[in-house]
């Protein structure tokens, strides 16, 4: 499996990208550049891999990009067609960068911002659905 980076990385951060890619190549670490992203932070909008290996894609409409929608990548529309991954989709608004699994994968930490960004969900229902999705 290759590490994936946004194809924007070499354009926006050429020196850092060159250092990173040279280092990866020197250690025979495969990597790929992903076309169609609108920002370099793939972790925020790509699917989250659960402890069992299932991929879950959340709606990515973070409050911090409310006034800058050009930076918001819609995984389902912009990237999923070219990747063909088996993904479970959720309408929960969640920045994947706010999802951190414990080393065992048995527990997950999520920023409490998930509650303010999903006002249509009662808190208990949101926690329950996240527990089901993230196993």
Model-identified regions with their sequence ranges:
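The feature marks the mature, well-folded catalytic cores of soluble enzymes
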Residues: 1-135
């Amino acid at each position: 499996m290759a590490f994936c980076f946004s194809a924007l990385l070499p354009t926006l951060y050429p020196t850092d990208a060159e250092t990173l890619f040279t280092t990866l190549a020197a250690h025979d670490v495969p990597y790929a550049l992903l076309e169609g992203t609108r920002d370099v932070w793939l972790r925020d909008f790509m699917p989250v891999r659960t402890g069992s290996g299932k991929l879950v894609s959340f709606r990515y409409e973070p409050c911090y990009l409310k006034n800058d929608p050009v930076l918001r990548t819609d995984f389902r529309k912009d990237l999923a067609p070219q990747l063909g991954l088996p993904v479970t989709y959720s309408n929960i608004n969640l920045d994947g960068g706010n999802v951190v699994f414990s080393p065992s994968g048995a527990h997950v930490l999520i920023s409490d911002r998930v509650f303010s960004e999903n006002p249509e969900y009662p808190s208990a229902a949101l926690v329950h659905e996240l527990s089901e999705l993230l196993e």
